[in-house]
Amino acid sequence: MSVWRPSEATVYLPPVPVSKVVSTDEYVSRTSIYYYAGSSRLLAVGHPYFSIKNPTNAKKLLVPKVSGLQYRVFRVRLPDPNKFGFPDTSFYNPDTQRLVWACVGLEIGRGQPLGVGISGHPLLNKFDDTETGNKYPGQPGADNRECLSMDYKQTQLCLLGCKPPTGEHWGKGVACTNAAPANDCPPLELINTIIEDGDMVDTGFGCMDFKTLQANKSDVPIDICGSTCKYPDYLKMTSEPYGDSLFFFLRREQMFVRHFFNRAGTLGEAVPDDLYIKGSGTTASIQSSAFFPTPSGSMVTSESQLFNKPYWLQRAQGHNNGICWGNQVFVTVVDTTRSTNMTLCTQVTSDSTYKNENFKEYIRHVEEYDLQFVFQLCKVTLTAEVMTYIHAMNPDILEDWQFGLTPPPSASLQDTYRFVTSQAITCQKTVPPKEKEDPLGKYTFWEVDLKEKFSADLDQFPLGRKFLLQAGLKAKPKLKRAAPTSTRTSSAKRKKVKK
């Protein structure tokens, strides 16, 4: 007798179909019109370790913090191509098309000489040298902090996108209700935030919130002990559906360890007894196992520079192939190979004998940038399918193009007063419409306005000439050549001689 039994195998149902994300090349048409745009010389001067605040007003800064270990996030503003004055507008239909910019060329210029900047802490929690110790040290005292300086990890970085970059760092997480006491090791949480101009990079001590996770303010140098060091979240930006945050990136990092030390203080988690055999005498009590190194970025050389050279964007890593939505582009730069800290000295009192108290010492760091771009003019045909896709991607784009829902005309009776300035009636003053808020207004960026710095004469600029050369294009002649004049030499007629 045969008996039917249901299958015990797992049945997998197909996923619900969703709309696919397509490349911008499928709905953005490129033209043969190119423009050059470049910034002026961008300079920054400040203190490399901390900002100097006004003694009477803590909210006002006298000297900002400018370090070679900071991110420089440039928010480059572009003109609206739909309001651009073109000599010939026959290449597009403003009723059915909209214009956008595509970034096809970029060069980040860096001034100032190569140099290695150092940092440190006048009271660093460094107990003993664990690299070449010739005898077992004794127990630490009440305060064993020392003045120590070091150089940092070497980093060169360039990120390009039409949205600000995303960074990651480790911060203090939320503990459960039945967790350990508050003075124990806090839980860690990976936090994603937008990288802003002035944020500190990873210096070799990890990307973490040092202000929250290090209560002694002495485990790292003074320029990061009260800050958060961020690292670009490449995994998240490369997996972004629309690819707006990261068109492409250039990265070069190197580091080695110079010295090895350990920390003083009570270990919150002691070394288990089964991992060592107890000693006697000076080794009866083991030393701190909280080891840490001092990083170093090693030699800097002009042969390994990422800057002062052009880069051409043929194909982006994501679905956005260089289209600058919102008429803006974000350029994120890190360059620790030019992190020299200059020492300034002023004389307080003049004396024939040198005395330290007769002089004041100051430290400053300077940075110099120059941004150059080549943009290609593109057009988007506004079909119903394309507009639906763009609205799902970013509805602000259609709003900037002045597309929106028009309310139907009202059929209800409206009230109109005769004496609009009379105090006997309610105020008839119309409330002005609120200006559109900048969604990125709460973040800090280095604003670069290129709205009036576009030029179609690419051959008049260094990056434009490089682009014309590699693209095989020729610049339009500026001077008309003089037409060659033809001179005829008429042969003299022979006189007839009568014989």
From Swiss-Prot:
In which broad location class does this protein mainly occur, judging by the first location in its UniProt entry? Answer: virion
Classification via Pfam families: Late_protein_L1
Q: State one molecular function term (GO).
A: structural molecule activity
What InterPro entries does its record include?
Capsid_L1_Papillomavir, Capsid_L1_sf_Papillomavir, dsDNA_vir_gr_I_capsid
Q: Which UniProt keywords apply?
A: Capsid protein, Disulfide bond, Host nucleus, Host-virus interaction, Late protein, T=7 icosahedral capsid protein, Viral attachment to host cell, Viral penetration into host cytoplasm, Virion, Virus endocytosis by host, Virus entry into host cell
Chain residue ranges for the region called Disordered: 476-499
Tell me which GO cellular component terms the UniProt record holds.
host cell nucleus; T=7 icosahedral viral capsid
Functionally, this protein is described as follows: Forms an icosahedral capsid with a T=7 symmetry and a 50 nm diameter. The capsid is composed of 72 pentamers linked to each other by disulfide bonds and associated with L2 proteins. Binds to heparan sulfate proteoglycans on cell surface of basal layer keratinocytes to provide initial virion attachment. This binding mediates a conformational change in the virus capsid that facilitates efficient infection. The virion enters the host cell via endocytosis. During virus trafficking, L1 protein dissociates from the viral DNA and the genomic DNA is released to the host nucleus.
What family does the entry list?
A: Belongs to the papillomaviridae L1 protein family.
Would you tell me the protein name for this molecule?
A: Major capsid protein L1
> In which organism is this protein found?
Human papillomavirus 33
